[in-house]
Amino acid sequence: MKLLVDTCTFLWLAAADPQLTDTARSACRSPENTVYLSALSAWEIAIKHRLGRLPLPETPARYVSSRREWLRLEPLAFDEPSAAHDVLLPPLHSDPFDRGLVAQAIVNGLTIVTPDEAISAYPARVLW
């Protein structure tokens, strides 16, 4: 299975947070699955850190890169087809990062790993 972790899921995986469900944790750790982290999540983390809403033990760039590698996640660029698909989505979610992740999941045939119930309203596969 090809999975796309949202920002919250990535942070919880990196911190071994107990809020992460067993289903999500198992799917993300399974060697049978390819798990992606979007550049959108890296950008969201950097913005939240700069605004003082997300304390990190190191720079956002170093944190995201080192945790992504440690968790064996593949990087996923936010490309032109995903950007074009984003504007076709109904305005069901106010967070532009989450809308971008939905677009990426649809365009790339990925399942989104997220606790965000609002994402389930979109025509994307969700795992939690």
Which residues fall in each region the model found?
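Short, well-structured N-terminal submotif of metal-dependent ribonuclease cores
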Residues: 1-37, 51-66, 108, 117-121
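Short, structured coil segments at secondary-structure junctions
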Residues: 71, 122-123
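Active-site neighborhoods of divalent-metal-dependent phosphate/nucleic-acid chemistry enzymes
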Residues: 55-61, 65, 69-115
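Alpha-helix capping/helix-boundary segments
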Residues: 9, 41-42, 82, 101, ...
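Generic structural signal for small/hydrophobic residues in well-ordered secondary structure
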Residues: 7-8, 45, 86, 105
